[in-house]
């Protein structure tokens, strides 16, 4: 096959990448919301926050998104979604197969690809290969005001490199089972009064309900979604049923949107 391809030399390749990357970082160094983790709850939250018009930045330590979605159930490529979470998946055109009334099977690759695409199309910025190392805090009133970030590769190499800071009106811990951001804040800012009892063993029916109910603010400016909620609130895990994950993301997005709107009204 003969084809005419535009000639682009190495200097232009590098310059365009550096310029556009730096413009993104410069713009998002002051964000409305920073979400840590691009798993199901983080992507769901990003979709609804960006859709609400908030400047939303998602940091993912890996070079891919989806979190636990990609692993499916013990590497089986299917997952379970139950009502009313199916409405969120339908909203972003993810296909579902009903296996009993109100219970659906979803393909894991389609689930994470379309959910991520929906968040990006809504206006969220997702940056891979970045680890959130710490938080920014302020006093009077005491609150979380952003995050400190580092390249994941730098941390893996155990290099002593200072982070850079990203300001945010709200920080969402969507890091999963370890609730990494909230754990750091609890340890380093004891004045926040955060106590983390840890996640319990599996009890799927209760876990799905309790995770959504307990989603939300942990301290001023700091929120939990998804499996981070189970860790922070001492709730059971649920395994490869993902309804609560996307519902939790939507719930935290709604709470943050209301909180930021209230703060703008007061200002």
Swiss-Prot record:
Its EC number is 2.4.2.59. Pathway: Cofactor biosynthesis; thiamine diphosphate biosynthesis. GO terms for molecular function: iron ion binding; pentosyltransferase activity. It catalyses: hydrogen sulfide + glycine + NAD(+) = ADP-5-ethyl-4-methylthiazole-2-carboxylate + nicotinamide + 3 H2O + H(+). One of its GO terms (biological process) is thiazole biosynthetic process. NAD(+) binds at residues 41, 60-61, 68, 132, 160-162, 227. Fe cation binds at residues 162, 177. InterPro entries: FAD/NAD-bd_sf (IPR036188), Thi4_fam (IPR002922), Thi4_prok (IPR022828). It is an enzyme of class 2 (transferase). Glycine binds at residue 237. Its cofactor is Fe(2+). Keywords: Iron, Metal-binding, NAD, Thiamine biosynthesis, Transferase. Belongs to the THI4 family. Involved in the biosynthesis of the thiazole moiety of thiamine. Catalyzes the conversion of NAD and glycine to adenosine diphosphate 5-(2-hydroxyethyl)-4-methylthiazole-2-carboxylate (ADT), an adenylated thiazole intermediate, using free sulfide as a source of sulfur. Homooctamer; tetramer of dimers. This is Thiamine thiazole synthase. It comes from Saccharolobus solfataricus (strain ATCC 35092 / DSM 1617 / JCM 11322 / P2). The lineage of its organism: Archaea, Thermoproteota, Thermoprotei, Sulfolobales, Sulfolobaceae.
């Amino acid at each position: 096959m003969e084809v005419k391809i535009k000639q682009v030399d190495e200097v232009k390749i590098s310059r365009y990448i550096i310029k556009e990357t730096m413009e993104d970082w410069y713009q998002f160094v002051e964000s409305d919301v920073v979400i840590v983790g691009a798993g199901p709850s983080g992507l769901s939250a990003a979709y609804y926050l960006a859709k609400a018009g908030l400047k939303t930045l998602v940091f993912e330590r890996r070079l891919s998104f989806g979190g636990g979605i990609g692993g499916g159930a013990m590497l089986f490529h299917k997952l379970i979604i139950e009502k009313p979470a199916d409405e969120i998946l339908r909203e972003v055109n993810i296909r579902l197969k009903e296996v009993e009334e109100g219970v659906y099977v979803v393909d894991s690759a389609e689930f994470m690809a379309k959910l991520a695409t929906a968040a990006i199309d809504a206006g969220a910025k997702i940056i891979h290969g970045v680890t959130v190392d710490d938080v920014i805090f302020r006093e009077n009133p005491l609150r979380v005001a952003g995050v400190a970030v580092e390249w994941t590769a730098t941390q893996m190499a155990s290099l002593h490199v200072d982070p850079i800071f990203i300001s945010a009106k709200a920080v969402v811990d969507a890091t999963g089972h370890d609730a990494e951001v909230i754990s750091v804040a609890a340890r380093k800012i004891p004045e926040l009064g955060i106590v983390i009892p840890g996640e319990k063993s599996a009890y799927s029916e209760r876990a799905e309900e309790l995770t959504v109910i307990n989603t939300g603010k942990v301290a001023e400016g700091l929120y939990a979604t998804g499996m981070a909620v189970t860790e922070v609130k001492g709730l059971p895990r649920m395994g490869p049923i993902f309804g609560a994950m996307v519902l939790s993301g939507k719930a935290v997005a709604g709470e943050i949107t209301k909180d930021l709107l209230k703060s703008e009204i007061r200002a």
